[in-house]
Amino acid sequence: MVEAGQGADGKGSTIWKGSRYPVETSDSLHHYAGALCMGVDVSGECASVFYVVESLPGEQSVTQELVDQMNAAGYRAEVVSAYQTAGGAPYLDYTDTVFGQVYEGMDIVDTIAQTAVDENQKPTADITINSVSIETYQG
């Protein structure tokens, strides 16, 4: 995962009018590689932390064991197939809010994911997101 949005205090506090908001899940939205998701804090609600699910090129993030678990849990065949193709984190489905999908620029996400980190999994050098484009996918 590539996580961001720590807020001005560096503690993940909310920037949305001082309020947290509940987790929203959908059977139509899954944690495929590139999914843009809101992190859940200790209260079980979302604040300002978000993350992108990543699966590095050549990395098998969805093992046969995970496929078997998804099948046993009743995942639809097309969802299992999409995970096998794209990679991702099916264990996060139905636990937090998926609200977008990176469809251009995963190479940048992969580069960030390979950055050196400290013992707390924080990058040893700060990484700043300077801009983001949010648009409706036309493909």
Map each language-model feature to its residues.
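Cyclophilin-like peptidyl-prolyl cis-trans isomerases
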Residues: 1-139
